[in-house]
Design a protein with these regions (language model features):
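Conserved alpha/beta-hydrolase
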Residues: 39, 44-67
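N-terminal cap/lid segment of alpha/beta-hydrolase-fold proteins
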Residues: 1-21
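Alpha/beta-hydrolase fold nucleophile elbow
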Residues: 93-104
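Short beta-strand element of the alpha/beta-hydrolase
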Residues: 24-32
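Glycine-rich nucleophile elbow surrounding the catalytic serine of serine-hydrolase chemistry
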Residues: 102-112
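Short coil/turn segments at beta-strand junctions that form active-site/ligand-binding loops
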Residues: 24, 51-52, 95-97
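Active-site signature of alpha/beta-hydrolase-fold catalytic machinery across serine-
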Residues: 42, 112-113
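Catalytic nucleophile-loop/oxyanion-hole region of alpha/beta-hydrolase
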Residues: 34-37, 63-89, 93
């Protein structure tokens, strides 16, 4: 199944992929510097095939989110976006655990969020 897209209250863009059957958890993907959520479509498809829902955020200044491209004035701007998406996920899937994964800069963001 393809990705759905949305925007958070902060105008940050995200993609989501849904498992076709009962999901066991939700994976939140945090991408690296200069990347965007669409680069993780193949990863999301593998997770959804294994009964997981997936969400991926375009960090501020990346992909379809607002801001100067690949520029971050404060590291807190990055963790705030992940926290906002995590809250959104909690409202959509209140009974499922959320697992954060990150690549490169996204790993540090996930560890700090």
């Amino acid at each position: 199944m393809g990705a759905s897209t949305g925007k958070l209250a902060s105008e940050r863009f995200f993609r989501s992929w849904s498992s076709e059957d009962n999901a066991k958890a939700v994976v939140l993907v945090s991408h690296g510097l200069g990347e965007h959520s669409g680069r993780y479509d193949h990863v999301a498809r593998a997770f959804t095939a294994n009964h997981l829902h997936v969400y991926a955020l375009d960090h501020i200044g990346h992909g379809h989110s607002p801001g100067k491209r690949a520029f971050v004035s404060s590291f807190g701007d990055l963790t705030t976006g992940v926290e906002e998406l995590r809250s959104h996920i909690g409202s959509e899937h209140p009974d499922l655990p959320v697992v954060l994964i990150g690549h490169s800069m996204g790993g540090l963001i996930a560890a700090r969020a």
